[in-house]
């Protein structure tokens, strides 16, 4: 029987429309330079949609952007998908060769480029096969000098357009955004999300982080500062529902720790999300204690939230909570949420839950399986492969059907991560499959070791890799960066880990061997999305072992 009535499409316009109904006079602020009301922002979004039409862009085509976290990026997050185009959020930290691949693979017809990235784009322009127009973006007045062809400045483009625009009715299954994985092996893979997937993810995040006590407790009218780059999986979808909630936006542009600390204090920011390296940079900043950061709540992803980092944040009045996911899951899908029986625990014990990979978001499922896809016991020790499913997991690697098939098995998405479930239903990620250490046939959790080492007072950061061993196949090796002015010996770190083993927090046989299992370095290398680059560490070890 045919359904009767209007089939309401779940598109991003829902968030935009409701924000305009609820809080048309709320403020979107960009650094110390500009601010707009929601109404002014909405009119600029309509101008940008008209601009796409004036540039000859057709619905279904891809439009790319290289930009910091600015008001322009927020405008594009609405205008480009709602025009019916595929919004390619270009990762500005990729290598030139990766950028060439991604822009050509996406077939971007228009490329929006911040002035800071002009030298990079100019150097590769002759290898970009599909770009017809470049839109240049700058914070300053005056003309921009460039060798790029067919250019127009962003504000001039908007000035030429009318605010009179009716967003077309598009299918909720229309492709809305495209972002590329980090590509640590081979070319990056393009991950596509539809309007429906983005809407359902944003609603779930809004509910999970907003409705439950002792979490992030995101509410309407709060102050929001994104500290995850907006090119990274739509800044976790938070900019969408923050508009619906009528939140005040503080957009930081290019990240500068001293300025971010000042804005957090002056604007009384309520909530943010970021990778652990950003929070580490802020809470260990020499001036961190000069600012009142009490009441700021932060969700962390990209790498394990260590106890050291969570406790340092708590000392400054900052509540932290981990989240787990990947590009293909949009990204967040589990979070270190407290349950009612945890509400009255002392903060030290609450932190033990905040730093876990967590329980699934509303509408999400996760389990741990063995090699034959049998679910493993939720006993806190049975380690296996983490598989997930949600209404918003990607169903497409862009133009790569075979890799898409590999991503899904038995209707579950294979994350490529290793972990376990505890008796309370909390997921703990112990490793990426490619980073996992199997010593004598048993798993060693590098993330747990890294967390333990980081709690040594002199340690700034630690990373653990597997190294060849003739007897056990692999053994762990810890790379350790110390805090400025601090000293420590390998024996000190080993004794510290022995105390953890004696307390039952790690297995004794996990402890790296002396002397080869401890390497002190000036800093731990990170890739362009802020994750520890273990390929570099493996190369460093191989060079040292020669």
Task: Go through each PLM region and give its residues.
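Conserved AMP-binding A3 loop
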Residues: 37-40, 176-204
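Gly/Ser/Thr-rich phosphate-binding loop
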Residues: 244, 266-274, 283-352, 365, ...
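Conserved beta-loop-beta connector loops within the AMP-binding
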Residues: 365-387, 423-424, 486-490, 533
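Conserved C-terminal "lid"/linker of ANL adenylate-forming enzymes
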Residues: 437, 463-469, 477-481, 491-546
